[in-house]
């Protein structure tokens, strides 16, 4: 593999990580970290991050702007598909009934998936549409902060 490509991809991945972390999402990079968060009582929004265009152009901006709302999950976390493979696989173990998809969002309540917003509900949609989908999840499963 070309060194310039590797450096470029490292930069792209780091930018994607920083963007979602700056929005307030905690990076989970191991299966143990995923279990310690998702087994807790309450609600957790999991963003399955990726380097694809719809993650950077739609999913991450929606993940950021959806938080300007009265009802929010107790915890905001992210795993990175293709990068933190162990953490991503463990998170997907919680997404029972849903096929692997990235980018995507899962709302976990008391250790169980309630609903997901899958890639096909993100790709080809505008940011506002995904924000609305996220805030609908918050309305259905979260309490006012």
From Swiss-Prot:
InterPro entries: BrxB/BrxA. It comes from the Bacteria. This is Bacilliredoxin SSP1241. Belongs to the bacilliredoxin family. It holds the Pfam family Disulph_isomer. One of its GO terms (biological process) is cell redox homeostasis.
């Amino acid at each position: 593999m070309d060194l310039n490509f590797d450096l470029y991809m490292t930069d792209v991945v780091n930018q994607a990580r920083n963007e979602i972390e700056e929005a307030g999402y905690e990076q989970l990079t191991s299966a143990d970290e995923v279990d310690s968060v998702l087994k807790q009582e309450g609600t957790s929004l999991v963003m399955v991050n990726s380097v694809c265009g719809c993650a950077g152009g739609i999913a991450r901006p929606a993940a950021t702007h959806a938080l300007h709302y009265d009802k929010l999950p107790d915890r905001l976390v992210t795993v990175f598909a293709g990068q933190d493979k162990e953490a991503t696989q463990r998170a997907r173990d919680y997404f029972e009934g849903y096929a692997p998809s990235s980018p995507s969002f899962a709302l976990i309540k008391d250790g169980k998936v309630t609903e997901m917003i899958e890639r096909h509900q993100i790709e080809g949609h505008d940011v506002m549409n995904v924000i609305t989908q996220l805030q609908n999840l918050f309305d259905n499963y979260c309490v006012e902060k």
